């Protein structure tokens, strides 16, 4: 480990928070790192040289106070990524809580606005699905997307905080007082297009 000088770190806004309940508000890929924030601001802090220099990218995710903002970030490749979150205090609210990027996080577009299950604490691309299939979990249940995050179907009311895929057909989930293994036998992805 090597400490980075404070004068090289990005400036944080007062009351900007970094929610880590799912351990997925940071994504690394090679020399690159994306760190997602919430609270007063929902932004992406980005470095492409191991933290020597930083850029800050704004997002359209709900923000402004307390438990609002980005809770999880994932990337399929260096350009294609997704953030999820919302308002932990009002988990059924489903506006401005999912956004995708096609340019490495510089710009973000809201998706499934008003058409998703609400607050999510973790999102993951499903391996070997060419960036098309994702799962998101939270206190509002488990949701699945087969179109890169543009639309979502709630597939379970089970509450989890985090999900991590082992391979295309299996994942570990954790929640309050529980750890589970998910085995995907077959997803009928045409059934909710």
Task: Tell me the role of every PLM-derived stretch.
Residues 36-39, 84-87, 137-138, 175-176:
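Recurrent small/Gly-Pro-centered beta-turn motifs in extracellular repeat architectures
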Residues 86, 112-143:
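Loop/turn-rich, solvent-exposed surfaces of beta-rich toroidal or solenoidal domains
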Residues 1-45:
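Solenoidal tandem-repeat scaffolds enriched in leucines and small polar residues
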Residues 21-23, 68-70, 78, 120, ...:
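Conserved positions at the start
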Residues 11-20, 63-68, 116-120:
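Short glycine-/Asp-/Thr-/Trp-enriched loop segments that recur within the blades
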Residues 32-34, 79-83, 130-135, 170-172:
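Entry beta-strands of beta-propeller and related beta-repeat scaffolds
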Residues 1-12, 45-63, 88, 92-115, ...:
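Asp-box/BNR beta-propeller loop motif
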